[in-house]
Amino acid sequence: MGVAASCLAVQFEQKTAEADSQGLTAEQALRWRSAIRTTLFVPDPLPPLAVENHGRFEPAAGVVAERVSYATQFAMRVPAIVYSPRERRRELPALIIVNGHGGDKYCWYAFYSGVLYARAGAVVLTYDPIGEGERNSQRKSGTRAHDTRQEPRQMGRRLGGLMVTDLMQAVSYLSQRADVDPERIAACGYSMGSFVLAVTGAIDEQLHACVLVGGGNLDGPDGYWDNSKPMCQGIPYQSLAFLGDRPAAIYALHAMRGPTLVFNGLEDTVVAIPTHGKSFFDNLQDRVAQLLGTRKGVFEADFVAHVSHRPFFVTEPVALWLERRLDFPLWTPETIRAMPTTHISEWVRAKGVAVDSRYASEDREGGLRALGAGVPGLSRSQLSVFTEEQWERQKGRLIYETWVRKARSRITHRQ
């Protein structure tokens, strides 16, 4: 632990004890949010968005997709696809998809979500995490380039902070759109994305609702998340030890922000759900309530038996939960329950859609019954923000290697 992190640990040990005895106050929550941002080097204030528009297309009947990019740390850019209903109206709810390891805006559940929820009347943003898609030096997907261990250890804190910054900038981008209701912005995070969203949802009060799937089972010292991928999860999570009971503190901050759902398959061995079980979540909810001094706003947890790692935000139960929080203009609970479903393994074969072989099995993504039907298989050329020539000119502002160089140049001994 660095000097700054050690100071935070001492400072917050007393504050955690105060929160336990008095209930978490707005002042204490503000201190925690500020400390999380400082620890992970999340800029405060965030960089100017400097939004650039790169064209649009219609991926499906009644749906428009915009190619955009926005700024993140060090004047770098995040390429994104933004889906919305073709018939424009003001004050729409909005949704952000936060990918799992190896995922990006090209992966099936990202664009499926975009089309699905645009049909519901929402604006949906999908983007490339650092090291994937158009932020990869070879413009490839599924590379997991950011998993390469970078020294010193502070680089892990900085990478976690970059991922949080990317997501916070997505929230800011949506909140300034004329067609988005800034009070109805939600995000859904899958696997690695569940961790990124767990942290972001604790500090970004612009988010109204959060859905964590294939994860969200934040545990204690030397648990699954401390020992998971070090650069994007393990080191960032360990660095938040100053919070004391990290899971309870993070979810208490969620409760003060808005509703949160954690949704998992009970056989999800990817993120160790079987070794946690339902009782783990019951206990965590109790600890959050104790920290808050009330059960109001404590996160919800739900499960599906006999299945493993899946992006459940494209399924009926999560869509119904989102409908209650966002009030989709073109859906009701009754229309959601009446919708057909799509067997993903059959759909990817029929449409020629790529899926990570590690997750293609029936107990994982392949067996998922996604809400809706008739979602097309979109191509890489459709989902690219830049042409190859444009990307070659822009890549210095996009790729992981540039970020590593810029981040390392900012490291000081005391950090």
Model-derived segments and their meaning:
Residues 2-66, 71-77, 277, 281-415:
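Alpha/beta-hydrolase-fold serine-hydrolase catalytic core, especially in secreted/extracellular enzymes
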Residues 60, 73-78, 85-95, 101-103:
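Proline/glycine-enriched tight loop/beta-turn segments at coil->beta junctions
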Residues 90, 96-165, 222-224:
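Cap/lid segment of the alpha/beta-hydrolase catalytic domain
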Residues 91-94, 120-123, 182-184, 205-209, ...:
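Loop/turn elements at helix/coil->beta-strand transitions in domains of secreted/extracellular proteins
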Residues 103-105, 132-135, 194-197, 217-222, ...:
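Flexible loop/turn segments at secondary-structure boundaries
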Residues 128, 188, 213-214, 263, ...:
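Alpha/beta-hydrolase-fold catalytic nucleophile elbow
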Residues 169-243:
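Primarily recognizes the serine-hydrolase "nucleophile elbow" in alpha/beta-hydrolase
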Residues 220-285, 289:
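The feature captures the conserved acid-bearing segment of alpha/beta-hydrolase catalytic domains
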